[in-house]
Amino acid sequence: VSSAASDVYKRQLKWLHQTTSDVLVITGSGTAAMEAGIINTLSRGDKVLCGDNGKFGERWVKVARAYGLDVEVIKAEWGQPLDPEAFRSALEADSAKAIKAVILTHSETSTGVINDLESIARHVKAHGTALTLADCVTSLGATNVPMDAWGLDVVASGAQKGYMLPPGLSFVAMSARAWEAYERSDLPKFY
């Protein structure tokens, strides 16, 4: 890829994510992008909240546990959105600031439900230290996902959904806070 073409796609990816942060390109699936976000910002034993209201929320719980994270699941029935108040309660109860991240799916592919990512991210921001890691594979490009305005730290997406491109590429946008967490992260990294 020429430097001119590279400049164009980097600029357009930032525009799509509504961010001034870095957007990285990975040759892999949306799952690879989300796993990359998890392993590059967290460390073994870190406490995380995972939203689970469908197949992909379920997947992030499994991935987080596979990497030795301490996972608290906030669950909703399939076909129902995650309750932002459940996240608020869990985050407010965390006076020791042990929760390092909230991991959730914006648009749950398996059911079509869109979770209130904006409200949940607002509660994470009020916590003060936790990161918001969002699976936006089916939402980015199809609905509004203003990364900077919502205070999202990691946004994972894939070419084959909202981008309407052939599969095989995925994208990980990382905030400055996510890059700081990367410096401390000790999980094994393949991406």
Report each predicted region and the residues it spans.
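Conserved active-site segment immediately N-terminal to the catalytic lysine
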Residues: 148-160
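Conserved beta-loop-alpha segment that forms the PLP phosphate-binding cup at the N-terminus of a helix
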Residues: 21-49, 53, 57-62
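Single conserved hydrophobic/aromatic residue that forms the stacking wall/gate
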Residues: 1-5, 9
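Short beta-strand elements in bilobed, periplasmic/extracellular small-molecule ligand-binding domains
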Residues: 69-77
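Active-site C-terminal subdomain of aminotransferase-like
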Residues: 160-191
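General beta-strand structural signal in soluble alpha/beta enzymes
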Residues: 24-27, 50, 73-74, 103-104, ...
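Active-site phosphate-binding strand-loop segment of PLP-dependent enzymes
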Residues: 82-139, 162
